[in-house]
Design a protein with these regions (language model features):
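N-terminal assembly/interaction segments in proteins that build large macromolecular machines
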Residues: 1-175
C-alpha cells in the first residue's frame, strides 16, 4: 500500500477492493472496540517485514513492529524478522543518531551533568565526563548502533550488512 503520508490519504486508499476507512469500520463492528488512526509511520524500502509481540491472534498483540529494508527479498525477510524482534525488545529512540531529537540529547546531558556534580567532580571534570556519556547514550539508543540481541558480538547494522541488506527505517507501536 503506497499512498502518501497523511491519515486522510491513507483512509481513502484502497485495500483489497475497499477503502482503508471501510476496512477499519468493519474491524470496529467485528471487534466491538472503537479504533482511530493516532499515528502514521511512513517507511521506505524494498521489503517491509512485520512482527507482533505477544500476539493474541494473527496480527494483533501488545507491540507491533515494521522494519523496512533494501536488498535481496529473502535475506531481508529473514534478518528483518530478527531485527523487528530486536526493536520490540529494545525500543530504540531512532534509526541513527541524527534521528534523536535535540531536546532528548540535551535532557540526557543535563542528567549526566547532575550526576557528575553529585559525585563532586570539578567543573572541567563535569563537562568532560558528560561529553563522554552522550555518545554512549546515543549508541545504546539508536537501532543501527545497538548490540544485536540475537548476536551481541555485532551491532544491528553489522548484522544487516553481513546479510547483504540495508535497514532503511522502522516503526514500533505499543498498546
Amino acid at each position: 500500500l503506497t499512498v502518501g503520508d497523511s491519515v486522510e490519504v491513507v483512509k481513502a486508499a484502497h485495500l483489497n477492493g475497499k477503502t482503508v476507512d471501510t476496512v477499519l469500520q468493519e474491524a470496529i463492528s467485528r471487534i466491538g472496540e472503537n479504533m482511530t488512526f493516532r499515528r502514521l509511520h511512513v517507511l521506505e524500502g524494498e521489503t517491509v517485514v512485520s512482527y507482533v509481540h505477544n500476539a493474541a491472534t494473527a496480527g494483533m498483540g501488545k507491540i507491533g513492529v515494521l522494519v523496512a529494508l533494501k536488498g535481496d527479498a529473502a535475506k531481508a525477510e529473514e534478518i528483518g524478522k530478527l531485527v523487528a524482534m530486536h526493536v520490540a525488545f529494545s525500543n530504540p529512540l531512532a534509526l541513527t543518531e541524527d534521528g534523536v531529537a535535540a531536546d532528548v540529547v540535551a535532557r540526557e546531558k543535563a542528567v549526566y551533568v547532575g550526576q557528575a556534580k553529585e559525585e563532586g567532580k570539578s567543573e572541567a571534570g563535569v563537562e568532560s565526563w558528560s561529553n563522554k556519556q552522550v555518545p554512549k547514550f546515543l549508541k545504546e539508543s539508536t537501532l543501527l548502533n545497538q548490540k544485536f540481541v540475537h548476536d551481541t558480538s555485532k551491532t544491528v547494522a553489522q548484522s544487516a550488512k553481513e546479510a547483504g541488506v540495508e535497514i532503511t527505517g522502522y516503526a514500533r507501536v505499543a498498546v
